[in-house]
Amino acid sequence: MASGHRVVDHIVGTLAASGVGHIFGVDGANIEDLYDAAAFRDDITAVLAKHEFAAATMADGYSRSGAGLGVVAATSGGGCLNTVPGLGEAFASRVPVLALIGQPPITLDGRGSFQDTSGRNGALDGEALFSAVSVFCRRVT
């Protein structure tokens, strides 16, 4: 079992304790630890899709079916951008979907790091983008 000291272990544990049985997504550099945390648990399953839009619509469908809260996970940059249409549909239809988006370390914000979506120094502002398709959006620091 992975050490319970990582933030991702706490996130996955909290999701599982809340009744979430599946996380849909595409693995990537800034989100891979979340999938590792899920792999060490028997009470939550990570379902990997071939595209982030597909993962977002899987989470939407999961929630619509009444199976539980739909959760989608993606990495920063292009990966997170690909979830926006699916999240927009869920938002417009008032379907609850939780999106978890990985980010580079905050010490690299605005310094040209790979797939920086911090909104600093000309980088894409992920929080502003997702605020348009969500009820609540915050970056955890």
Language model features by range: what are they?
Residues 1-141:
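N-terminal alpha/beta PP-like core and its mobile active-site loop of ThDP/TPP-dependent enzymes
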